[in-house]
Design a protein with these regions (language model features):
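Conserved PLP-enzyme active-site core in the AAT-like
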Residues: 1-155, 159-168, 172-188, 196-204
Length: 205
C-alpha cells in the first residue's frame, strides 16, 4: 500500500512540516511513501532548501528532467537499491527499455548541472505575470509560489480571450471551467511576460 504526494502541486509548495506528518502517518498505517517530485527542484528553490531535504521523508521519489529543467525528455526514479532493482525489472517486463539513450542522458545531466538555480528566474517571471494580470479587469489571480499562474476569467470573456491569445502565439490552457493555467519555463523571458500581458489586456478589452 502506498501514500503518494506531489510537490509542487498546482504550483504550490508543500511545507516541510506537512511532509514530516505524512511520514508519521505512513509509518503508523504501514504505508510506503512516494513523492511525485516532477517539480521538486522548483519546491527546493522556493523553500531555499536542498532537494535532498525535501526527499528525505520518502521511500521513493520521481524527478522530471524536462519540466522546468529544459531537458528534451527523461525522468529519474530514486529509492533504495532493492527498490530500484525491482523497478528495473518491472520496466523491462512492461517494455520500457530504451537503447542508445546516451545523448538524452547527457542532456539530462546538463540540465541538472546548469538549470537548477535558474529556476528562480521562472518564479520571478511568474510573479511578474501574476502581478500584471491582477491589474486587469475580468480576471482574478491565485497567489503564486513557483512557476505556475492560475487565473480565473469571466465566463463571457474566456473563449474570445483564448482565441486571441492563440493568434498571438500564446498558449493558455483551460484548466477547470473558467480557470486558466500559465507556466513559465526555460524558454520564457521577462520580455515574453510583457508581450503576454499586452495580449491579455487586448483580449480582455
Amino acid at each position: 500500500r502506498l501514500l503518494c504526494l506531489e510537490n509542487t502541486t498546482w504550483g504550490k509548495v508543500l511545507p516541510m512540516e506537512y511532509l514530516a506528518k505524512a511520514r508519521q502517518f505512513a509509518d503508523e498505517h504501514g504505508l510506503a511513501l512516494h513523492l511525485d517530485g516532477a517539480r521538486i527542484l522548483n519546491a527546493a528553490i522556493a523553500l531555499g532548501k536542498p532537494a535532498a531535504d525535501i526527499a528525505k521523508p520518502f521511500d521513493s521519489v520521481s524527478l522530471c528532467l524536462s519540466k522546468g529543467l529544459g531537458a528534451p525528455v527523461g525522468s529519474v526514479l530514486v529509492g533504495s537499491a532493492d527498490f530500484i532493482k525491482q523497478a528495473k525489472r518491472w520496466r523491462k517486463m512492461l517494455g520500457g527499455g530504451m537503447r542508445q539513450s546516451g545523448l538524452l542522458a547527457a542532456a539530462g545531466i546538463h540540465a541538472l548541472e546548469n538549470h537548477v538555480e535558474r529556476l528562480a528566474e521562472d518564479h520571478q517571471n511568474a510573479s511578474l505575470l501574476a502581478e500584471g494580470l491582477a491589474a486587469l479587469e475580468h480576471i482574478q489571480v491565485d497567489p503564486v509560489q513557483t512557476n505556475m499562474v492560475f487565473a480565473t476569467i469571466d465566463d463571457a470573456k474566456l473563449p474570445a480571450l483564448l482565441d486571441h491569445l492563440k493568434r498571438q502565439k500564446i498558449l493558455a490552457a483551460g484548466y477547470t471551467g473558467e480557470k486558466v493555467r500559465l507556466v513559465t519555463h526555460l524558454g520564457i523571458t521577462a520580455v515574453d511576460i510583457e508581450t503576454a500581458l499586452a495580449a491579455f489586456a487586448e483580449g480582455l478589452a
